[in-house]
């Protein structure tokens, strides 16, 4: 039979690791690039866009559609990095257990 006190200590330890991982993710920054670096998006671990950098060569009316696409690609690239880091950080906090694909933490 499993010792209840030992189980409780493990649960508390896991909870502490989860809180630490959440804080680490909330403070992290992820850079997504598109068009060979012509567009760069910096997003927080919460998925909020912090900064968008656009090369001046794209600031022409005839480049509008391409610019919109590059911003989308750069943001998605930053979001993918955030999601991967989140999975890895939380897996460590959960002693190697993997979260289901697409699972999002509430932060």
Curated annotation (Swiss-Prot):
Keywords: Cytoplasm, DNA-binding. Gene3D superfamilies: Nucleoid-associated protein YbaB-like domain. It holds the Pfam family YbaB_DNA_bd. The keyword Zinc-finger does not apply. It is found in: Cytoplasm, Nucleoid. GO terms for cellular component: bacterial nucleoid; cytosol. The keyword Cytoplasm applies. One of its GO terms (molecular function) is DNA binding. Belongs to the YbaB/EbfC family. PANTHER family: NUCLEOID-ASSOCIATED PROTEIN YBAB (PTHR33449:SF1). Homodimer. Binds to DNA and alters its conformation. May be involved in regulation of gene expression, nucleoid organization and DNA protection. This is Nucleoid-associated protein A1G_07310.
């Amino acid at each position: 039979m499993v010792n209840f006190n030992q189980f409780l200590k493990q649960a508390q330890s896991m909870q502490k690791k989860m809180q630490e991982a959440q804080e680490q993710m909330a403070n992290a920054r992820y850079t997504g690039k598109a068009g060979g670096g012509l567009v760069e998006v910096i997003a927080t671990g919460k998925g909020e866009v912090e900064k968008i950098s656009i090369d001046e060569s794209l600031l022409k009316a005839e480049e509008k559609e391409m610019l919109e696409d590059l911003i989308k690609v750069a943001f998605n690239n930053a979001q993918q990095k955030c999601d991967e880091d989140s999975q890895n950080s939380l897996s460590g906090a959960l002693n190697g257990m993997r979260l289901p694909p697409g699972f999002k933490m509430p932060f």
